[in-house]
């Protein structure tokens, strides 16, 4: 992974990558946004112009101003996204954890809704050519195929994403221009007065904001994927993308003005812009665009989970890297949970217009939480206080209005995304609280008090040698400390004699790509403590990293790793390395409060479905000893036990 990101360098390749990765979601919104706003209403000029004005100014205020101009300033060494932003400021205030968890879980919930909505909207265009064709099986087949290829990496097809999306946006613009030329009066809708009229004068107009919001649901991706493309490439490419989107929306508006006095019925404004001869091609391009949008969201979900793990928000599930390309991450458990969720959404709602009711509510919460975190970031960076208050006030009001308007969707399907978000958020809260409980209850001792005993044990030939090099994974952050459980394992559980003892600690930093280590020599050629400082986006391949540390130390003549058996030493045979990983369980002898006991029981239940710590750290299973140790809180006190004499 690179350690320096050229955020402000613009290149043709970068612009194309941005087109393919970032704008899939927001770029496919024209498929369903205006149809959702108009819905069953009678088409009339002020409704159409009000809808267009609302879309235009939402894109301007929400996407252009908030995300492209303001939020992209908050980069964590080139990386963006709600967890990257949280990592920048989490040490300043503990309460920031709550908005980070709400925003992250809502964003993951959105990953279950967006692919079905996007793909269904594209495939339903086939009904214009083949009215009797069943769309649900086709949508399920496409989504299943998409999730199946994740395990093999998407670097090959990924190279085509940019050009395909360039074709898509060009098509949006051309179709829009052709229709606008037939009804230029639609340009009046640039006037924000029409948006004001829609919200205040049109019956139930305020509640239409829930559908208007669909035009900007992909805005969060601009920030989340900043590390892939760079800030400058996003800002420059957005100019082109926004022009294409606005032209298409206004083209649809021009067509709607041509049918004023009617209702939409089964007609889809997006496809009505296409001449009949182009319809099959247009549907094909739309399908490819929605697949790309879904792919970007899946990849984003994998990245989000990997960050959540390192921030102690999520269980340590297995992560795989199918290719060396940056961003190519695969999380099997999340992949198939997303697949099951997407298929469930398709089977439950069947049509995209039904799915739209479940869409938007979750992502509104994410945007609100990003606003809170960003305001605190600006405050911590000593920006003008009035400017911070203005930013917070404007966007809390705007996004609060969108949230309230989206709440009307709750009984019609919005509950689905809320339920998914609550489940994900619940896991995050439980995992974080369990981590904090374990941290509070962990007992540490000073290493220097045991170095003499460790050296004596190492030379006690009456005890069988356990390993030449014995490596303990430790949670003790201080160089001078170690868990009491490690000392217990060395001396009491079964005395473990070794030539050299190693204590390895991994410290996850708020900087995404830190890769550093420090060695503390406790006793030359007897005991060492190695501390790795790894960024929250770095794969924790401790087996590989530890080998590198040993090589460096041998080269610098800091340690001799040759076996100390005389016959092997003469042959310069390297001694064996054995890792010990301590896995805790909740002992019955504890006095935890009921709430904390419940948290820990749920924590250990979930942990039973996750890989062991040794697999997470990439340790060779043949050289790992996993020891179960009780999470003993304190000895049970005041037991009245009477001894009987016979």
State the predicted function of each range.
Residues 1-646:
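The structured alpha-helical core of multi-pass membrane proteins
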